[in-house]
């Protein structure tokens, strides 16, 4: 999997422009070193949630080669030491790097496998202050198994705890060619999240007027 991660900020006032700004690149990582930049990235530790219960520090799950960051899922050959049937590699920026507003894009190729669940997503930087799902979750990309579609979704107290998933619609799918590198992105605006793949807009999640709490908690550093 090759990931080129970009953060771009609008050159105009996000309150004044009409969401067609000129973007200014403020940060990128092309993973062209021998190892991921440890001032930005850490390996994700094992955890209880489904997405985290096979995460491993095993070096076999990580590779940097020819400008590629390769995150792998492998069969665990030592279940006496670790009961997980599979081991997977993952990186996050937790406690190291955060951004507020702008566009995030990730270029990646996803190899399919039964049970595979690769994902690219954001959570609030201050996780101790904003417990899930109160601070929201932005799924820039999720893919299942050998699918030729990806999911782009938001989660929050409004969508998850209150179960309001269609007012407004909280996610959408879009076809991809799994054999290609694809660019997955989201634009953070004060009044909406705009999701896109390969520059094509997929869907918009707007902030709406509602008496229910937690509908749009995304105007915080991610």
Regions found by a protein language model. Give the residues of each.
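Bacterial Sec-dependent N-terminal signal peptides
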Residues: 1-21
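GH16 jelly-roll
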Residues: 18-222
């Amino acid at each position: 999997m090759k990931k080129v991660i970009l953060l771009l900020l609008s050159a105009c006032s996000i309150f004044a422009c009409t969401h067609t700004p000129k973007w200014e690149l403020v940060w990128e990582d092309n993973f062209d070193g021998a190892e991921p930049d440890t001032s930005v990235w850490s390996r994700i530790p094992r955890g209880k949630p489904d997405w985290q219960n096979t995460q491993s520090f095993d070096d076999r799950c990580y590779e940097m080669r020819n400008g590629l960051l390769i995150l792998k899922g492998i069969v665990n050959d030592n279940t006496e030491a670790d009961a997980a049937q599979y081991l997977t590699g993952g990186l996050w920026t937790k406690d190291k790097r955060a951004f507020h507003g702008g566009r995030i894009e990730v270029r990646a190729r996803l190899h399919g496998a039964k049970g595979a669940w690769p994902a690219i997503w954001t959570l609030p930087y201050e996780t101790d202050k904003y417990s899930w799902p109160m601070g929201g979750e932005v799924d820039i990309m999720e893919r299942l198994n050998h699918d030729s579609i990806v999911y782009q979704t938001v989660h929050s107290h409004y969508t998850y705890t209150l179960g309001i998933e269609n007012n407004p619609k909280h996610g959408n799918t879009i076809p991809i060619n799994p054999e290609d590198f694809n660019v997955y992105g989201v634009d953070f605006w004060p009044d909406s999240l705009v999701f896109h793949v390969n520059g094509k807009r997929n869907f918009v999640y707007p902030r709406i007027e509602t008496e229910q709490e937690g509908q749009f908690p995304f105007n915080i550093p991610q």
